[in-house]
Every structure is written in C-alpha cells, then in structure tokens.
Amino acid sequence: MSSPFLEVKERIFENSIGFVIYDKFAVSKGHCLIIPKREYPDYFDSTDEEIIGLNNLLFQTREYLKQKYNPDGFNVGINSGEYAGQTVFHMHIHLIPRYKNDVDNPRGGVRNVIPGKGDY
C-alpha cells in the first residue's frame, strides 16, 4: 500500500499516532482528515491506542476549526470499505465543518448518504 496521505507535507496537527491535514477535495471550508501514521484500510483494524490517539486529534482539530472558521456544527465520518464509498484505503476520519444555510435542509445529516433516508 502506498498512501497519498503520507506524501502531504503540510500537517495541521500531529501526535505519535497520527496527523491532521486539510482534505484536498473539501466539501466545506475547513474540512479535515485525521489519519493514522500506520497504514491500514479499515477503522475496525485500529488498535485501542490508535483510537485514543486519533480521537485526541479529532477533538484538538474541532477546537482549532471552531476558532478559525466558527462553524455552526460538524459531521464526523468514516468510509469503511469500497461499498461505503472508501476510495483511499488508508483509514481516515473526516471532520467536516457545517455552516447555517450550507444546504437547504440539513435534517438527517449523515443519513443522507443514502438518498431519501435523511427524512424520518
């Protein structure tokens, strides 16, 4: 496996477990990826230590984005497997800032990955 994430030199945060970069194909201002240093494809292959280290980066990045961009909310997401939409098979967590009126109706949030399932 040769991860394109490891080639990115500009890192926002880093700890012994992982690092944070801006998403090259951001869906909103401030969209970040939290990435483990160890290359593995699936979140469910993470060790307990990795989950803790990545979660620490996730919270640190959330605070940074709140200060820098003042979003109104966040989506946190992981695509686990090809049929869940994963295209880079180096596990990563999306932290997507959301802004009032960035979509007509945000109801359902991540449920909208399946068209028509966001309303309930």
Task: Describe the predicted segments one by one.
Residues M1-Y120:
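HIT superfamily nucleotide-processing domains
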